[in-house]
């Protein structure tokens, strides 16, 4: 799999060593990211994903040193390292290098990774309801695409797979349907697309 990462003004190939055991992001979870797709020569809503990455960093108390527009330019530069029709996953990331419990915002770092990621084939899939729920906004940074939220989603997904299902429906703390463990949830009924109402417990999809 071809992978390119932009870090500190350079493009690095493969899976470079970026954080260490003393990095705040590794041991105290101050990492945010976003994920966009490129396929057939287009990257829909890439600008919106870049903007959300910046907002997520700010929610986590970080100090992003790049604007959404600058991140977009880096992403477009990275796309040119692949075939025009390549199916890519584009992931800008911010994290703190230093701090104890609270991140030190002055140590905020940035990278952007692009990797080949074929789109899944459309097919049916089976879901189950998870015992794990989304957190309240008062207990977790639910308005950011924060890495610290994903272990709970991972538990829900592993639980579903142990039961023989492909994914899990995750509820909010009040019992409302929120999302799937690994994606926003949509269904179509009578020609109308339906998705759960945004209530602050999960991230609004782009």
Predicted regions and their residues:
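Ordered, amphipathic secondary-structure segments that act as subunit-interaction surfaces
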Residues: 75, 84-93
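Helix-start/capping segments and mature chain N-termini
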Residues: 1-77, 95, 103-206
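An exposure/low-complexity boundary signal
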Residues: 82-84, 101-103
